[in-house]
Every structure is written in structure tokens, then in C-alpha cells.
């Protein structure tokens, strides 16, 4: 239940950030082409397989060996992208990796982090595919838009 709640919270926070902040809109625009050609079944398959592989590697294998902080940092670094929003994506992935690792540390099970990760990936891939964003207006969006 903890993992599912965290996954839903992160997916909701992603939507709020994309609607409100220029940096999140830019990241959304840079990632959106990756969903081109994905079907609903493809999104589910990608969300499940990537989550399973990453949780087995980062939380199951690396966290017991490297610890919570280092596995989270490595998780973020390995999510590095090309493009102007790469630092945002890597930072976000580091924070999420830390939280997933904390769930694993608290519960001693990969079930929670896996549920969270699959929900985050599935819901965010669906959102990326189905929602376009308008270009941000100037630098003011860095601190949020006013409407």
C-alpha cells in the first residue's frame, strides 16, 4: 500500500509541475517524442519491465551493497538525458530513487518500490503520450506561472 500511494503521489505531482512550471513543461516536451508509437499495451509492458529491471538492480542488488544514498545518486545519473532539461530529470530521478530505496529499507521488500515504480512509469508515460504542453512564456515560469 505504501508503494502504491507513493507512486500515485509522484504521478500527481508530475502533472501539477507540468501544468505550473516552465522547467517541467520543457522536460515534458523533451520526453514526449519517446512515447511516439507506443500503444496502451506498449506503455504497460514498458512500465512493468523497466520497473522490474530497475528495482531488481538498484534496490535489490545495489542498495544492500552501496547504501541508500549512493544507489539513489547512481539511479539519477543513469537517468541522464540529452537536452536542456537533463539536470532536472536526473535530480528528479535521484529523489525518487531515494524514496524508493527508503520504502525498500523500511519494508525489507521490493514489492512496494516495484508497485510505486510501475505506477509512476505507467501513469507518466500515458500522460506524456496524451498531453501536449504549450511553450513556456519567458523566464517567469521558473518560479511558477501566474494565471
Each predicted region: which residue ranges?
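Membrane-helix interface/capping segments
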Residues: 15-31
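Hydrophobic membrane-targeting signal helices
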Residues: 10-13, 17, 79
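Alpha-helical transmembrane segments
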Residues: 1-11
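Transmembrane helix-loop-helix hairpins at the membrane interface
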Residues: 23, 33-147
Amino acid at each position: 500500500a505504501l508503494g502504491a500511494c507513493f507512486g500515485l503521489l509522484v504521478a500527481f505531482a508530475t502533472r501539477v509541475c507540468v501544468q505550473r512550471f516552465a522547467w517541467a513543461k520543457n522536460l515534458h516536451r523533451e520526453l514526449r517524442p519517446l512515447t511516439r508509437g507506443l500503444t496502451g499495451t506498449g506503455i504497460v509492458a514498458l512500465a512493468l519491465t523497466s520497473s522490474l529491471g530497475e528495482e531488481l538492480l538498484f534496490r535489490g542488488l545495489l542498495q544492500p551493497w552501496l547504501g541508500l544514498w549512493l544507489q539513489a545518486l547512481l539511479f539519477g545519473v543513469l537517468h541522464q538525458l540529452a537536452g536542456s532539461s537533463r539536470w532536472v530529470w536526473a535530480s528528479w530521478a535521484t529523489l525518487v530513487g531515494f524514496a524508493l530505496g527508503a520504502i525498500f529499507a523500511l519494508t525489507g521488500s521490493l514489492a512496494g518500490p516495484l508497485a510505486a515504480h510501475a505506477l509512476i512509469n505507467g501513469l507518466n508515460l500515458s500522460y506524456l503520450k496524451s498531453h501536449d504542453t504549450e511553450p513556456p512564456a519567458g523566464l517567469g515560469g521558473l518560479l511558477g506561472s501566474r494565471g
